[in-house]
């Protein structure tokens, strides 16, 4: 005997792109039954169980349904912006010259430290809303522009508040090992002491961080210093991720794999050894085409090696004031295809299935399957490849967040 299924809402009248296993796996004329914010039944409409009852039925007029988008790498909370420096760079002023004038990341650190929480919140809301308009239902937000215990906690509190004020799930990452603050010039190990002994334990104790990140690069922190950060994160019970191999090959992504990091991000200079280690560890490669584009880089991430070694590839906006002031995940999907040669199917998996894995959420998010969170998007499109094809326009018809239409 078939048991009765009762749901709050039955959504039907569109093709459902489930993204199970990172593939389209489209259900023609599909239906999704949701209850208490979860998917309780999914399949073709003609296969609806006779025992299924719904409090409401919502019929779409064609189109496609995809999982909600996940932006798994952002720096949305910061003070000010660096549009003046953008103009300077276009006029031939080097990054080193800008930094010598007090610009670069240190200018953002100053603006972030000077801003109170309400001002940071106001600015972050302005940046987050365009992502939500495109169907983002889950977003990761990093700290990393405070670089003191007080300012890092301030950033993380603002990130948490964003998830309370807007209908979006926010995952927070403590990125205190992002840059060397000016007061620690030539004392990087001392600053790492502060990160490991004070900032990470405070963030964990306050419940403000879901993960810990670091920037492993010649202009930031060495693999040995990052290893200390990872040890502190693990002691605090937090998973790790890493900015790695963006500008040079330092072995950061292999280090991340050794620590079973959720993800290693950027990866333009990753090697086959890195890709093999990441594949073995299940570490996701998060590709950030916005930074690649704005910095006019010429070395692409080794996508073929990631495919060869079964490394899941996610895509994110890397929204930040310096190298990727990008507030469109749809544009990142197109850039990943045109610049990095991902297929449209891989790119869609990059903002759904694999983005969920990059945040440790693969059991609950990223695909449309029974038991998972009811976050999905209805698009006025006929094929999922159109999500990578169109530049601008074509916003969602409807975004469903936890089983309810997001207003």
Curated annotation (Swiss-Prot):
Its EC number is 3.5.2.7. 4-imidazolone-5-propanoate binds at residues 82, 145, 178, 246, 323. Fe(3+) binds at residues 73, 75, 243, 318. N-formimidoyl-L-glutamate binds at residues 145, 320, 322. One of its GO terms (cellular component) is cytoplasm. Gene3D superfamilies: Metal-dependent hydrolases, Urease, subunit C, domain 1. It comes from the Bacteria. InterPro entries: Amidohydro-rel (IPR006680), HutI (IPR005920), Metal-dep_hydrolase_composite (IPR011059), Metal_Hydrolase (IPR032466). Zn(2+) binds at residues 73, 75, 243, 318. Binds 1 zinc or iron ion per subunit. Pfam families: Amidohydro_1. GO terms for biological process: L-histidine catabolic process to glutamate and formamide; L-histidine catabolic process to glutamate and formate. GO terms for molecular function: imidazolonepropionase activity; iron ion binding; zinc ion binding. Pathway: Amino-acid degradation; L-histidine degradation into L-glutamate; N-formimidoyl-L-glutamate from L-histidine: step 3/3. Its cofactor is Zn(2+); Fe(3+). It is found in: Cytoplasm. NCBIfam families: hutI. Belongs to the metallo-dependent hydrolases superfamily. HutI family. This is Imidazolonepropionase.
